[in-house]
């Protein structure tokens, strides 16, 4: 278990792919965040139960043991102030399974870029989008009219265009 001393907060990265965790760690630590890693949802929940220092959760949606959404629900039940960034390579499935993001949540497509990850975490940190044109198209938030959200509304028959 790592003991981060962050300038911008501590991010718990929960992903079953070691390479994704390593990439996120390298990007985030290089930009002033502390990082704790979990290989599955159960491990992430246990970390939050034993650490008061987690500020953000990066949650892979499709993990063994416990899916990312269930993990995030359990973690937010313990610590409602933790902000959640869902990451997945299957973005089309996200809004089919779960039509709404709630406050303090965002979504980022995998594979993500350095800029995409940093902007998504920054968005969660500030709680709003400062300049919508600065947010990459792959980031979806509860209050953004993104291509994924438009696709979802069209699929659900909510947007006839």
What feature does the model see in each segment?
Residues 39-43, 66-71:
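Acidic catalytic/metal-coordinating carboxylates
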Residues 112-122, 133:
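C-terminal output helix
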Residues 60, 88:
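Active-site residues of response regulator receiver
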Residues 46, 69-81, 96:
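Short amphipathic alpha-helix used as the core "switch/output" element in two-component signaling
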Residues 128-161:
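CheY-like receiver
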Residues 22-30:
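Charged docking surfaces used in two-component/phosphorelay signaling
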Residues 63:
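Receiver (REC) domain active-site loop signature in two-component systems and cognate sites
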Residues 37-56:
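Acidic, metal-coordinating helix/loop segments flanking the phosphotransfer/catalytic sites
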């Amino acid at each position: 278990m790592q003991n981060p001393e962050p300038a911008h907060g501590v991010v718990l990265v929960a992903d079953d792919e070691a390479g994704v965790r390593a990439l996120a760690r390298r990007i985030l630590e290089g930009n002033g965040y502390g990082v704790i890693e979990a290989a599955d949802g159960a491990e992430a929940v246990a970390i939050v139960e034993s650490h008061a220092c987690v500020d953000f959760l990066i949650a892979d949606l499709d993990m063994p043991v416990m899916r990312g959404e269930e993990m995030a629900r359990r973690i937010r039940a313990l610590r409602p102030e933790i902000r959640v960034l869902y990451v997945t390579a299957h973005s089309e499935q996200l809004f089919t399974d779960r039509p709404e993001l709630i406050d303090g949540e965002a979504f980022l497509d995998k594979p993500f870029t350095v800029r995409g990850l940093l902007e998504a975490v920054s968005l969660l940190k500030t709680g709003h989008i400062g300049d919508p044109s600065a947010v990459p198209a792959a980031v979806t938030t509860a209050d953004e009219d993104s291509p994924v959200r438009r696709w979802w509304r069209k699929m659900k028959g909510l947007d006839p265009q």
